[in-house]
């Protein structure tokens, strides 16, 4: 085995480009092909799939097409496949993968992992004193009136390593952390121990960078004009070394860009702190050194790691209720009065605002004072209503709005299909004590239990960051430029919780007055 493991990612979400898997396998040498398909609310899509189409479903079906495209190539080139496309039903997904292997007469061995699904154990957890409090709101799940539909713990990487150690060629995962599909193969390759925290932290950083696909290679990049071409954009590859350092790159002759900027941007994605927490390790992103080694090759080193926490994060999706709404265009004079008139009339006709659980009214003044076109003359009024009672926000609510079309403000214009209607989901992030996690690997007729690191007898280690020295700069007279010319941003979300990461093009800008304005 070589001293580097090359891990390529072919998917950043359920709906990503299906052709990428084949392109990653055919585009150059790789050791592992990974794919991330599970955003938080994707779990409810898979839940609805099971409810409507059968209990044997609940996985990411499009992965099967990708697998069929690459199975023979991966078999011939000894490329491992690790994916979280198992979703809510990794066992069924594994069975479908095995059917394709038999059909193609290949010699690939399949493992699957489960133990993330906490729905059958909610009563047990409640009686054991677990509150599953909402991380953002501090509410107790079991005293909340809304019904959970899915509840899945984010499993770590050690089940994946166990499967690979036992000879699996394909590992089908359920809800694991996004980076676990990268950490697991790296830990397998180098036979890392549970407390090799610096190495694991490096692999976590690598996994975090490549897990959203083309976002690491120029997609959604603030300085998009630096990207030579977006045609046939290359997806990211992490070349991980035994010490946890790594190179981010892409296949040659593909579009996109791998630069210090694109890597930095993706490091800031979906994080709330430089100490990035996973069930296997805490990775301190503020210890990373990021260097441009060559064109489309960025070397990342120096990552420090700490012991993992004693709890696992849980993604819970609740049946939030039902919603409806409308969006109306208001044109010409007296926009505020028109908005007030139609809003009052709508709620008078349906029986008042008080009957709804939530009412959201937003008037967006996109109109201009002296418009040169009809579009410049328009503002838009958006009205959203939510209720646990589907009848209150159903077809009757829509009908009451439509029947005002000839009987209210002048110039009535509605926009259809803009405001979502029907059931809605409420995302509930929580923590559960890791002692309740029962992760299992199923392979070759055997079942192996994987105990979380925090439940093993390892000394707790927490890296204490040394303050970085940043040179002060001499500021010249002010010049007015756009903020976005010198600072980049990357937004990310976990369900209903969003973050915005901001970075400066160089360290000196970090000490400027402009950076102080950002921090304040």
Residue spans for each PLM region:
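Catalytic or ion-translocation cores adjacent to nucleophile or general acid/base/metal-coordination motifs
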Residues: 103-118, 183-224
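Flexible, glycine/charged-enriched surface loops at secondary-structure junctions
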Residues: 107-110, 216-231, 274-292, 349-364, ...
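Gly-rich Lys/Arg/Thr-decorated short loops/hinges at beta-loop-alpha junctions or inter-strand turns
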Residues: 2, 41-56, 118-146
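C-terminal catalytic subdomain
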Residues: 296-360, 380-384, 391-396, 496-503
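N-terminal amphipathic/basic leader segments beginning at the initiator methionine
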Residues: 2-22
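A conserved active-site cap/scaffold subdomain adjacent to cofactor or substrate pockets
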Residues: 210-293
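C-terminal amphipathic alpha-helical interaction region
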Residues: 392-493, 498
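Single conserved hydrophobic/aromatic residue that forms the stacking wall/gate
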Residues: 510, 514-519
């Amino acid at each position: 085995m070589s001293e580097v493991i090359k891990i390529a990612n072919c998917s950043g979400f359920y709906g990503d480009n299906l052709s990428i898997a084949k392109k990653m396998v055919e585009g150059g040498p790789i050791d592992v092909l990974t794919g991330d398909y599970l955003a938080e609310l994707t779990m409810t899509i898979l839940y609805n799939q099971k409810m409507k189409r059968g209990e044997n479903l609940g996985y990411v079906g499009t992965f099967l097409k990708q697998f069929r495209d690459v199975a023979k190539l991966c078999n011939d080139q000894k490329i491992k496949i690790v994916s979280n496309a198992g979703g809510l039903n990794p066992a069924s997904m594994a069975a479908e993968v095995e059917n394709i292997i038999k059909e193609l007469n290949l010699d690939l061995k399949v493992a699957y992992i489960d133990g993330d699904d906490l729905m059958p154990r909610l009563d047990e957890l409640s009686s054991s004193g677990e509150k599953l409090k909402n991380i953002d709101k501090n509410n107790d799940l079991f005293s909340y009136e809304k019904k959970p539909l899915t509840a899945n713990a984010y499993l770590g990487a050690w089940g994946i390593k166990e499967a690979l150690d036992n000879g699996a060629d394909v590992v089908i995962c359920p809800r694991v952390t996004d980076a676990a599909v990268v950490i697991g193969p790296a830990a397998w390759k180098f036979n890392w121990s549970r407390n090799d925290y610096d190495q694991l932290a490096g692999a976590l950083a690598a996994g975090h960078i490549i897990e959203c696909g083309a976002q690491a290679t120029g997609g959604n990049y603030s300085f998009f004009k630096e990207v030579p071409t977006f045609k046939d954009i290359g997806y990211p590859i992490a070349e991980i070394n035994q010490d946890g350092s790594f190179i981010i790159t892409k296949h040659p002759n593909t579009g996109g860009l791998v630069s210090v900027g694109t890597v930095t941007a993706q490091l800031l994605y979906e994080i709330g702190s430089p100490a990035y927490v996973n069930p296997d390790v805490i990775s301190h992103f503020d210890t990373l050194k990021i260097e441009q080694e060559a064109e489309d090759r960025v070397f990342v080193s120096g990552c420090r790691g700490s012991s993992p926490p004693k709890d696992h994060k849980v993604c819970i999706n609740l049946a939030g209720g039902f919603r409806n709404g409308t969006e109306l265009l208001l044109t010409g004079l007296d926009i505020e009065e028109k908005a007030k008139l139609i809003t009052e009339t709508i709620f008078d006709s349906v029986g008042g605002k008080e009957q709804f659980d939530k009412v959201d009214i937003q008037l967006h003044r996109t109109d201009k004072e002296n418009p040169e076109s009809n579009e410049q003359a328009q503002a838009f009024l958006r009205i959203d209503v939510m209720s646990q009672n589907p009848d209150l926000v159903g077809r009757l609510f829509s009908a009451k709005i439509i029947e005002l079309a000839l009987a209210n403000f002048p110039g009535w214009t509605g926009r259809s299909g803009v405001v979502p209607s029907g059931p809605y989901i409420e995302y509930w992030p929580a923590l559960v004590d890791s002692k309740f996690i029962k992760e299992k690997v199923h392979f070759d007729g055997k079942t192996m239990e994987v105990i979380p690191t925090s439940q093993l007898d390892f000394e707790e280690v927490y890296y204490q960051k040394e303050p970085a020295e940043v040179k002060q700069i001499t500021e010249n007279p002010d010049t007015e430029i756009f903020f976005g010319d010198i600072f980049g941003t990357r937004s990310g979300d976990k369900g209903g919780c969003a973050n915005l990461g901001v970075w400066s093009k160089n360290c000196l800008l970090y000490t400027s007055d402009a950076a102080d304005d950002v921090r304040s």
